[in-house]
A protein has these predicted regions:
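Bilobed "Venus flytrap"/periplasmic-binding protein-like clamshell domains
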Residues: 30-33, 37-49, 116-151, 182
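A ligand-binding cleft/hinge motif common to bilobed small-molecule-binding domains
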Residues: 85-97, 175-204
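Ligand-binding clefts/hinges and TM-proximal coupling segments of bilobed small-molecule sensing domains
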Residues: 58-61, 140-151, 195, 228-253
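Periplasmic-binding protein-like
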Residues: 28-31, 108-112, 189-225, 248-253
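Extracytoplasmic small-molecule ligand-binding "clamshell" domains
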Residues: 20-97, 136, 158
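Extended ligand-binding regions for polar small-molecule ligands
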Residues: 44-54, 117-120, 132-133, 210-248
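Short helices/loops that flank or line small-molecule/ion binding pockets
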Residues: 66, 70-83, 128, 162-183, ...
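Acidic, polar ligand-binding/catalytic clefts
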Residues: 64-128, 142, 200-203
Length: 253
């Protein structure tokens, strides 16, 4: 009898130890470098980094969930347990993040004005864009410029993607474009773009954090805290930053 009990323990123990907590990682950033074709991009790679981390000990199975921003807002409001990737505190209301906990910044990003080197544009406030054609992305709101765009002092032409804007700039159809520095760095590395002029003054700067939302559990919260504290010195994270051209904007905190 004792021998049978021992055998059962040896059989069942690995199954019990192998039970994993599923943790959703949400993203509403669908542009490079965060999402690429064929399940590639920084978001997928970050999930793999968590799942393969030795400190995880197979306790947690992180899964990427791609959501439009409105559905993210619903999950936050309902206190749904999960982790929001690459989020910026100023882009959310206090009520939306009342049940969440912010990590330290992972990336220090900004909205850059990019132009051709033979016709460089330097941003000095909305008035400096008067009479120019600005390339924007559909659905993006540039608060500081909205009044001048509405009055048609600034001509804004929208496209679906940042890459389309770059192509329009290179063909001379717009004077300047707005693009996140993270996306610009990726395309510079991936497409080996020639010299482009980047305004010394961006439209604005913003930090990208993780937002741990809802009752996700003390164990996973404690694990993520330790993982993120060590992230700046994690060689696998450094490889990802190099791969996507993001070393210049990586936070050292």
């Amino acid at each position: 009898m004792q021998r049978l009990v021992l055998v059962l323990i040896l059989v069942l123990l690995p199954l019990a130890c192998g039970a994993q907590q599923r943790v959703e990682l949400w993203t509403y950033h669908f542009s490079p470098p965060f999402l690429l074709e064929n399940a590639q991009g920084l978001s997928h790679a970050f999930v793999e980094l968590l799942n393969n981390d030795p400190g995880n000990h197979n306790r947690f199975r992180f899964e990427l969930v791609e959501l439009p921003r409105k559905r993210v807002d619903v999950r936050l409001a309902r206190k749904h347990p999960g982790v929001l990737l690459w989020a910026t505190p100023s882009f959310f209301t206090a009520a939306q993040v009342a049940n969440g906990k912010w990590s330290q910044p992972l990336l220090i990003d900004q909205q850059d004005f990019v132009s051709l080197p033979d016709a460089p544009f330097e941003y000095e406030g909305p008035e400096s864009l008067h009479g120019l054609v600005l390339g924007g992305v559909l659905g993006h709101r540039y608060a500081e410029l909205e009044a001048d765009i509405a009055s048609k002092a600034i001509t804004r032409q929208d496209v679906q993607t940042d890459l389309q804007n770059i192509q329009k700039l290179l063909s001379g159809r717009i004077n300047t474009l707005l693009i996140p520095r993270s996306t610009l760095l990726y395309y510079r590395k991936e497409l080996q773009l020639g010299e482009l002029y980047v305004s010394a003054t961006p439209l604005y700067q913003f930090a990208r954090h993780l937002l741990i939302n809802g009752a996700i559990g003390e164990a996973v919260t404690r694990y993520l805290d330790g993982f993120l504290d060590a992230l700046p010195n994690n060689p696998e994270w450094q490889i990802l930053l190099y791969q996507y051209g993001l070393e210049p904007i990586a936070s050292e905190q």
